[in-house]
Amino acid sequence: MDHARAALSNLFSVEPMSYTRFSIARQTDGDNSHVEMKLSADDEEGGDIERPEHMHVSMAQPQRNGKRLCFLVIAAVLLLLIGFLIGYLSYRGRIELAARCQDGSGGCEITPTASYLVDGEGTVEEEIQGPPVIFWPELKAMLSKKLSAKNLVDNLRWRVGVDSFEAGEAEDTNMATYIHEEFRNFLDKVWNDEHYIKLQVRGSTKNQVSISINGKEEILETPDAIVAYSESGSVSGKPVYVNYGLKKDFEIIQKVVASLNGTIVIVRAGKITLAEKVANAKEAGAAGVLMYVDSLMYGITDTLIPFGHAHLGTGDPYTPGFPSFNHTQFPPVESSGLPHIAVQTISSSAAARLFSKMDGDTCSEGWKGAIHSCKVTTKQESQIMVKLDVNNSMKDRKILNIFGAIQGFEEPDRYVVIGAQRDSWGPGVAKAGTGTAILLELARVISDIVKNEGYKPRRSIIFASWSAGDYGAVGATEWLEGYSAMLHAKAFTYISLDAPVLGASHVKISASPLLYMLLGSIMKGVKNPAAVSESLYNRLGPDWVKAVVPLGLDNAAFPFLAYSGIPVLSFGFYNKDEEYRFLDTKGDTLENLRKIDNLDALLAAAAEVAGQAALRLTHDHELFLDIGRYSEELLAYQEEFLPYIKEVRELGLTLDWLFFARGDFQRAVTALRRDIANSDGENRVIRRALNDRMMKVEYDFLSPYLSPKDVPFRHIFFGKGPHTLRSLVEHLQLLKTNRSSVDLNLLREQLALATWTIKGAANALGGDIWETDNEF
């Protein structure tokens, strides 16, 4: 037994069981010897072996060092193998359980283990053990179960019996206070944002439209509605009808009428926004614009007169590019989108009387609409004139945007924003009430899931109620302008809830390509209100992307995408062939909205799509953004450019560099996908860096070579101006249709801006600066 103990002692002891006292100082007598005291294993056990009674002066010799080292190596290898097997089996078990949870085939209770993580500043923090993880199938089922159609309709009743919620007025402020209090009941953080803006409102005298025949004046209408940002004053001119006021409509009419200078243009509502119609009329030389609602497209609307605005842009037109904070010293500038011509809306009955008094050529069948007495213009020698008196006045008003937030647990400084317009010129039930109702219900439900069901969103969710939306998304745009330096780096998606139900026949989707894949996935899990046995995805089919409606200036999501470079999503229901007749009128009431079949189910479906989008974007480790979709969009544009290669070369230019830039972007997408596949999914720092590269793709398509003050909508896909890819295509088309009108210097600039914006987006997506170069 003693020999066995001695053997074990020798095996696990690197040094002999002895200690030596060395003389530190040099010995004066030159003796460099040392004294050794040897302790045997037997001594430790208190055995009977005789103890040495003298000190050894000789050095102990190591024994069996080679054999001992061999045993140590074998023991270490065995321990390593055992540890590896234990870790592998444990990890495999967790992965299998996670897979069962994701597809809903098994139980879903996994408790995170504690691990030490390094954040971006280099400090070490311990991840605290939390409650069981809620997996996506369970989370979306919670949302669907908790959403209440009854609550949605109840939230609409706030607008019953109120004639107007005009921005900055008492009813708008009262609604803001109510929303603020509701947010306080549900959310972690609630705050207000004040802006001081210039709005054009009704004057002390009503506007008036009259017709003069041989000097005899007759009043056609004195409408209650106004068009904000119209030029005030009195103007007269010959009436000319230009259908919907599209550019192609003006091209057609200019072949019939020698000149439109000084005329009063008549257009019908639809196809494009009123502001775009007015801009086209101004470009053609018109002195004023009258717009009416045609019952062929809107149903029976003889007496309805819509409100509107004529600013070709968003935000406060008197502080373009600047936030309208009270302490800002504004420069004396105004938006280039202001029309400076008189604009007024009239009823279809007034338009019919006006047409009946015109004596020119009859409209073509495609232009007639519901008014069969439609005339294009008057005879050249006739003395028929239309007079437009506009008495609008400017007012300085304070508006409130209301915000509430659910803070994320892993990346609280990254957030998805859900917003809805609150104000309206009339009752605004469909225009603003439905979106606000969904906003409040989502705030309640998602807060309940977080507080009571244990869901811990990785990223924050911000709920926003905007004011002055009827004046051109003023509240939303001023917020973007005020916090642009922060928002483009932190807000990664905006979900618009405005006007989600304007009909029941068709689904209306407007979105950034980055969110197509997310939306397709969500629609597979939301029931079709028209047939609950199928999903929304089944209703639309696999080619639903082809039905995506481009965002317009009348959508509050537009400045988020085109001005700030934030991916956006807008979802709702409408009738494609018949506009909602009461929109922007005094008839936009709950009673009229109730005429839409299955209203409750439509509201619930729209709310569920928006809620699922917000939850999915805060649930997964990896952001649900499809970066490869923009590569497909670029390829589609490249196919449009191909027919003009020869004509471009004849000008001494080339499209090759533009094509090479697209290739660079595709390679950057492939590289990022490879980095994601090869990364450690459990490393929070790496995950955040990869997500940041994805979330900035949209922003990188804002042309960096343009001033946001002069060209606010800089997005090369969805912006407005000659820098866009669509404008480049239209310019190239002139090479075949009207070569003499091609501006060579502009074409050079367009090619350069497009090429280097795409190349810059590819470089940013590629990662660090040492991973990029300036070669194609």
Curated annotation (Swiss-Prot):
Which residues are covalently lipidated (S-palmitoyl cysteine)? 70
Domain PA: start-end pairs: 230-322
Q: Which Pfam families match?
A: PA, Peptidase_M28, TFR_dimer
What are the UniProt keywords, alphabetically? Cell membrane, Disulfide bond, Endocytosis, Glycoprotein, Lipoprotein, Membrane, Palmitate, Phosphoprotein, Receptor, Signal-anchor, Transmembrane, Transmembrane helix
The way this protein sits in the membrane is described as: Single-pass type II membrane protein
Coiled-coil segments on the chain, per record? none
Side Extracellular, residues: 92-776
Does the UniProt entry include the keyword Lipoprotein?
A: yes
Protein name per its UniProtKB record: Transferrin receptor protein 1
Q: Which organism is it from?
A: Gallus gallus
Protein encoded by which gene: TFRC
